[in-house]
């Protein structure tokens, strides 16, 4: 924020006090040189101090500061002007004022984040308090020192008022809903992949993604780790067979692209918006931790699913880091671009650049140098020249960069499908070479505005990279969408054979992967590039043997003898690899997820609150395992409830909590039909260790559905078709 020299305010309330001080100082100066004067300096000081009948009161001063001033980003007040306000206050209160240094300490008690800047023209600069403004209700109110804008005086004497820079907070996006996810009716599913299960998974995953988005908006980034862990490690057993399908993996990739784009738009809607330092720090921390959280949450899941999740999350983290650094460069470049003197000097240096030589050197980097490329470089040169000449704001430069990428990359790649990466590489090479040549030319000629050009060059480079990375992510999502719909290649009807087949045999269990499964040989793992291989995955070759054991980290072990058919009550044969248990044909084991206690895993992800769903006979279709006789009692743990009071995304309005639609809290008007009813069997798959109950109480995560008091719904925000989000959350953004 640039502030110029601010004149002292002309206030009638202080004129008399200033005149009296001048008269008294003049009389003291005369009397000190008079031979008649017999009053010492100590007596004069004592007389001066005794003018006020009341001693100085710091609490009264703090109260006065609170009533008349407020924190405002980008507003400057001269230190002398604020001290004059304070002296006027002391005079009206008939109290003894403190000196300017002591008053500065009192101000910092009331406004600790206040900073001091020396502003003004050379030789006439003054100290200013930066970040404080006079309230409109104050008697000292002046538009120059208010939130409506800070004023400065340029060389021509023209006063301009700048817009106040308001720090952005993602809380303004509360209630944001995700765009539509893919519809199962539009997908080209293999015949052996049940459409019903895919539809159920999309519903579950949309709810999971919506929760992550809501958590990010409320700034509770640490809860994202818990949601990831509970969703993937608490997946219902009957949904596990579909996770390794290439179609479901593509669905996850498309949905993740939608989620990441929504999060990016919520955290930083535009790179030009000023962000608080606290928000920038938590965004960078979140981008750094997301990959580690996914490694833990996706432990022992199908390899192609892990790969697509890792690939998209790392691209998303890179874009977040790019946005934060770009935002910092934009704020620094704004002060340069909005200065008339700097832009005038930049224009002069820009026109002194040897354009012909730079153009020839740039064209050397092109594969096929053509005349239209030379004309394009000259056209871009002239457009930037016009922006400098018009002293355009930074928003105009951003629009120019957007149009440049649109003309040079998007339109060219649109004529040749699948060529986006190559076209972007060629443009980036030309752009980097031209910018480097310009900076080199200015360095050799000692251009006065070299520093400003260097800053603008950094900002332009980062913004172009940000646009190209965003285009690449969108292209990747489009590829996954085409593969999901079967437009690129027909769906492999044989890849889902494992859902209905008997259990193969092997001497040692291997982690489940469709690319290595006996029934899915030759099926490629769609969306699983080698560059995004999971560090935890270790390939184990499957061999033929007498006993094959398929386990899942959160379920029980099922063992079948080689050549014998699978028992009707056994688990399906596409569980995750784990340690083999030999002995009986049906073995029971404890949940073996290794990071359960460390990450507070409860072992359950309950979707029973979702209504308007068709009921399925899950108990008869997926029989539970028999309990081992060696264990005295079954394990009983509390479920991880997710109530429709918080996320009734798929509920009818009549089944939503009545208090969301009226002022009185009531229970549900009709019972909610559970999507998957709780099976009261002795060997329930999901468990919650007692240590979790002590570390994470139920109220910390999700409160049970119960009547609530009217006081709990104050300040609540309501959104049609969605649960309320309390605007006064415990953990919020720093204002």
Curated annotation (Swiss-Prot):
A single GO molecular function term of this UniProt record: RNA polymerase II cis-regulatory region sequence-specific DNA binding
Record flagged with keyword DNA-binding: yes
Cross-referenced InterPro entries: DNA-bd_RFX (IPR003150), RFX-like (IPR039779), WH-like_DNA-bd_sf (IPR036388), WH_DNA-bd_sf (IPR036390)
Region (Necessary for dimerization): 315-487
DNA-binding region: 44-126, 61-136
Subcellular location: Nucleus
A GO CC term attached to the entry: nucleus
UniProtKB keywords: Activator, DNA-binding, Nucleus, Transcription, Transcription regulation
GO biological process: regulation of transcription by RNA polymerase II; ventral midline development
Family stated for the protein in its record: Belongs to the RFX family.
Physiological role: May activate transcription by interacting directly with the X-box.
Protein name: Transcription factor RFX4
Source organism (scientific name): Danio rerio
């Amino acid at each position: 924020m640039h502030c110029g020299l601010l004149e002292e305010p002309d206030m009638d309330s202080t004129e008399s006090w200033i005149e009296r001080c001048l008269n008294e100082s003049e009389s003291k100066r005369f009397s000190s040189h008079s031979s008649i004067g017999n009053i010492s300096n100590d007596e004069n000081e004592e007389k001066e101090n005794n003018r006020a009948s009341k001693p100085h009161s710091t609490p009264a001063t703090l109260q006065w500061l609170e009533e008349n001033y407020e924190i405002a980003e980008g507003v400057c007040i001269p230190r002398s002007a604020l001290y004059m306000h304070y002296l006027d206050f002391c005079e009206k209160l008939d109290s003894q004022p403190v000196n300017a240094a002591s008053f500065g300490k009192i101000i910092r008690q009331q406004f600790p984040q206040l900073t001091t800047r020396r502003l003004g023209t050379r030789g006439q600069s003054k100290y200013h308090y930066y970040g404080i403004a006079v309230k409109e209700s104050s008697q000292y109110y002046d538009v120059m020192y208010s939130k409506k804008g800070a004023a400065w005086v340029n060389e021509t004497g023209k006063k301009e008022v700048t817009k106040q820079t308001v720090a952005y907070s993602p809380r303004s996006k509360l209630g944001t809903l995700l765009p539509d996810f893919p519809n199962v009716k539009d997908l080209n599913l293999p015949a052996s992949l049940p459409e019903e299960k895919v539809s159920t998974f999309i519903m579950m995953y949309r709810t999971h993604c919506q929760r992550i988005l809501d958590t990010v908006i409320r700034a509770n980034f640490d809860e994202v780790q818990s949601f990831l862990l509970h969703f993937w490690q608490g997946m219902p057993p009957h949904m596990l067979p579909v996770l390794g399908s290439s179609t479901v993996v593509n669905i996850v990739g498309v949905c993740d692209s939608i989620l990441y784009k929504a999060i990016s738009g919520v955290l930083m809607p535009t790179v030009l918006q000023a962000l608080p330092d606290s928000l920038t720090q938590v965004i960078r921390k979140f981008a750094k931790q997301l990959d580690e959280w996914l490694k833990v949450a996706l432990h022992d899941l199908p390899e192609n699913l892990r790969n697509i999740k890792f690939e998209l999350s790392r691209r998303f983290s890179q874009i977040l880091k790019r946005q934060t650094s770009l935002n910092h460069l934009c704020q620094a470049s704004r002060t340069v671009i909005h200065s008339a003197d700097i832009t005038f000097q930049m224009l002069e240096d820009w026109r002194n650049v040897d354009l012909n030589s730079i153009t020839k050197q740039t064209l050397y980097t092109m594969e096929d140098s053509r005349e239209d490329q030379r004309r394009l470089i000259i056209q871009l040169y002239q457009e930037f020249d016009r922006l400098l000449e018009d002293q355009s704001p930074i928003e105009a430069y951003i629009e120019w960069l957007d149009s440049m990428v649109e003309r040079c990359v998007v339109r060219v790649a649109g004529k040749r499908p699948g060529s986006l990466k190559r076209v972007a590489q060629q443009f980036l090479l030309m752009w980097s070479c031209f910018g480097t040549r310009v900076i080199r030319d200015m360095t050799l000629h000692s251009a006065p505005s070299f520093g400003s050009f260097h800053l603008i060059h950094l900002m332009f480079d980062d913004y172009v990279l940000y646009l190209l990375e965003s285009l690449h992510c969108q292209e990747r999502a489009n590829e996954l969408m085409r593969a999901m719909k079967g437009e690129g290649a027909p769906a492999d009807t044989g890849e889902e054979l494992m859902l209905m087949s008997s259990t193969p045999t092997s001497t040692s269990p291997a982690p489940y992967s469709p690319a290595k499964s006996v029934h899915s040989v030759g099926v490629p793992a769609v969306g699983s590039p080698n560059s995004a291989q999971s560090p935890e995955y270790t390939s184990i070759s499957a061999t033929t043997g007498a006993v094959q054991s398929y386990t899942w980290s959160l379920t029980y072990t099922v063992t079948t003898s080689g050549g014998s058919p699978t028992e009707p009550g056994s688990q399906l044969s596409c569980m995750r690899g784990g340690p083999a248990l030999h002995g009986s044909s049906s073995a029971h084991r404890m949940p073996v997820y290794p990071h359960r206690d460390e990450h507070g895993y409860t072992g359950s992800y309950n979707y029973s609150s979702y209504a308007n769903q068709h009921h399925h006979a899950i108990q008869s279709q997926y029989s539970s395992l028999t309990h081992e006789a060696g264990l005295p009692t079954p394990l009983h743990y509390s479920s991880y409830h997710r109530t429709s009071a918080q996320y009734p995304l798929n509920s009818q309005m009549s089944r939503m909590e009545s208090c969301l639609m009226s002022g009185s809290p009531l229970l549900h008007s009709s019972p909610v039909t559970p999507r998957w009813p709780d099976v009261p069997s002795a060997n329930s798959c999901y468990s919650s260790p007692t240590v979790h109950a002590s570390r994470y109480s139920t109220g910390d995560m999700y409160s049970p559905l119960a009547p609530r008091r009217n006081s709990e719904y104050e300040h609540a925000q309501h959104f049609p078709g969605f649960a309320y989000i309390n605007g006064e959350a415990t953990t919020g953004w720093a204002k």
